[in-house]
């Protein structure tokens, strides 16, 4: 009896162990959580069942395109505005990364004429990257003024302060190296790198300014060469006249200031045209919109000026005759309608100032304000 009871108890314990073992294994598998199965197991605090979920950081995106950074879209920091941009929205120049907006304005060298040629969108974006409000700007000139006031806000002021600190760190590193040759402070290397950045930026601006100045100088020299070529084609007499004029200007410096450019109204007769210099003849033709590009000799210019003078005299005469005819016609027109001829006498005053049609409508004379009794039509013989 006892042996049968013990064997039954052992079989029950073995069955219990098998059930508990399978439950424990199922509880540890990933597909079967701890709450499923015949037995529930409470996980201890020291050994959690599942690994904690990874906390995701803030999603940083590109300031220009708004896309998140990845392996193929690397993040770069603009050296001017200190904002994050991707590789497609930034430009690499001299080992420096700038965003497209800062690079566009950097190319203008912050000159007002060049900034006025840019789009309003680029100017506004440049100011927004530096946290400068643009709500009060109504015109493009306001944006340009703000850009000139706040240029280099993100990098210029910082670079100025860093340059001071770099100079101090360099001096300190010099003294420390003299006493401690084995120790090289890292601040000296950082300051030297910042100094190189400042030098590169200064050289870039100076190169732009020198290029603009050289272009202006070359343009001025081209103009002077063109004028010299034109003067070489003149005769010796013209050179003598120019020398005489220069001598007069040297003797009387106030005369050159008072002397104006030659005009057609200064001529009183055709004989004066022969005594004028080539430069004066060209000035007269240019002021009257006459082309003289094909003229190689002085006599050709003289002929053009003579023809211009004659045409001007004829135009003045014809204009005077037309004005006289117009005055006569105006004298014979009705003073009320200015359309019909005066052919009416107003009685009792006897004034003739209107046509018959207007005289019948008048209640009083427009000259003497006398009451009109009758308007009589008059025929001119």
Swiss-Prot record:
It is a peripheral membrane protein. A zinc finger (FYVE-type) spans 56-107. Proteolytically cleaved by caspases upon induction of apoptosis by TNF. Autoubiquitinated (in vitro). Pathway: Protein modification; protein ubiquitination. Residues 221-249 have a biased composition (Acidic residues). Its main location: membrane. CDD domains: FYVE_CARP1, RING-HC_CARP1. Residues 115-134, 273-287 form the SAP domain. SMART domains: RING. PANTHER family: CASPASE REGULATOR, RING FINGER DOMAIN-CONTAINING, E3 UBIQUITIN-PROTEIN LIGASE RNF34. This is E3 ubiquitin-protein ligase RNF34. It comes from Rattus norvegicus. The gene is Rnf34.
């Amino acid at each position: 009896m006892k042996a049968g009871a013990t064997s039954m108890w052992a079989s029950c314990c073995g069955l219990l162990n098998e059930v508990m073992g399978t439950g424990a294994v199922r509880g540890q598998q990933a597909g079967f959580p701890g709450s499923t199965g015949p037995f529930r197991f409470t996980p201890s605090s020291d050994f959690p069942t599942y690994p904690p979920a990874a906390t995701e950081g803030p999603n940083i995106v590109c300031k220009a395109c708004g896309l998140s950074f990845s392996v193929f879209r690397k993040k770069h920091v603009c050296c001017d505005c200190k904002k994050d941009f991707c590789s497609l929205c930034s430009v690499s120049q001299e080992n420096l990364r700038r965003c497209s907006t800062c690079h566009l304005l950097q190319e203008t060298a912050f000159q007002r004429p060049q900034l006025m040629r840019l789009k309003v969108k680029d100017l506004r974006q440049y100011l927004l990257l530096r946290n400068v409000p643009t709500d009060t700007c109504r015109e493009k000139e306001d944006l340009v003024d703000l850009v000139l006031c706040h240029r280099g806000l993100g990098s210029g002021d910082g670079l100025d302060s860093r340059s001071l600190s770099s100079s101090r760190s360099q001096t300190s590193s010099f003294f420390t190296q003299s006493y401690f040759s084995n120790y090289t402070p890292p601040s000296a290397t950082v300051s030297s790198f910042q100094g190189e950045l400042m030098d590169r930026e200064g050289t870039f601006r100076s190169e732009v300014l020198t290029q603009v100045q050289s272009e202006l100088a070359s343009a001025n020299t081209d103009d002077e060469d063109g004028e010299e070529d034109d003067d070489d084609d003149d005769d010796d007499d013209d050179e003598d006249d120019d020398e005489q004029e220069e001598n007069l200007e040297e003797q009387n410096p106030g005369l050159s200031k008072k002397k104006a450019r030659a005009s057609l109204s200064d001529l009183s007769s055709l004989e004066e045209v022969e005594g004028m210099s080539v430069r004066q003849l060209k000035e007269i033709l240019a002021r009257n919109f006459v082309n003289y590009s094909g003229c190689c000799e002085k006599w050709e210019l003289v002929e053009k000026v003579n023809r211009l003078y004659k045409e001007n005299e004829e135009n003045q005469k014809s204009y005077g005759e037309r004005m006289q005819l117009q005055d006569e016609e105006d004298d014979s027109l009705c003073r009320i309608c200015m359309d019909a001829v005066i052919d009416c006498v107003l009685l009792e005053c006897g004034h003739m100032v209107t046509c018959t049609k207007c005289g019948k409508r008048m209640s009083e004379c427009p000259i003497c304000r006398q009451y009109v009794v009758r308007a009589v039509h008059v025929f001119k013989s």
